[in-house]
Amino acid sequence: EKLIGNPLYHWSHLELQRYFGYTGHLCGDTAEEVWNLCNEQLQNKWSVRSLIKASNVTLICTTDDPIDSLEWHKKIAEDDTFDVQVLPAWRPDKVTNIEKPDYASYIGKLSEVSGVEIKDFASLKEAIKNRMAFFAENGCSVSDHGLDFVLYHPASEETIDGIIAKRLSGQEVTREEMMQYKTEFMLFLAREYHRINWAMQIHYGCKRDNNTFRYNQLGPDTGYDSINNDATAAQLADFLNALSTTNELPKTILYSLNPADNEIIGTIMGCFQDSE
């Protein structure tokens, strides 16, 4: 009852009516009734597959980390009883977010899975190319990036080597170093997407995990995110222009969680409609 005005209110009631035949009002007083109704039908009437089929879904793209084995995608692809395509989508946020506490340990896992010892930018790119080839073999053709904002702080490969070495040694990176690394890593990825004909999807405009007290209690992504307004039009335009200049701008999907960015995105996208 506290969600009126939010799309979640409409979506929730639409799904309850469409799949479970419930036409009432979901609130604290009816929560147990709705819970029991849905669970009874999930036991007897609905399965995950039947819900997918009833929704006329023909393709599902999951969000997958570069180190994922994709074992379930392989099993679904071999299952003749399910004709809905289920394909992986490439989500390398853990490689992008060099400032996060688990970056070094994650890079160790990426090294192991890719078979490449990652110690600098060149070896990181080699490992990423290996994993992208594996994803492509399993049907992937789209990426997904969750950024605070699209940035453009270019730097030399030597500079990025130093930033990676610094972070892998356990040191913190400065904000400028973080932005340089993310810029060059995203440019590298975008050029690879263009080369292998993947679409690049970028969404931004979210300030995550705002409530530290609740984060420590519940962990990340538990309902304490908000709209962010850090995005700058100039950096987005410069990022796309750097790729367009060398004719390496991939098919691109852009959207912000901040509706104030929509007109900016629309006008900037209009400047790059001649890319191959």
What is each PLM-predicted segment?
Residues E1-I196, E248-G266, G270-E276:
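Metal-cofactor-binding active-site regions of metalloenzymes
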Residues A199-K207:
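Histidine-centered catalytic micro-motifs
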Residues N211:
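Hard-cation-handling environments
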Residues Y215-G223:
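Short glycine/proline- and charge-enriched loop/turn segments
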Residues D225-A237, L257-I264:
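A general structural motif
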Residues F239-T245:
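Short, basic/hydrophobic alpha-helical segments
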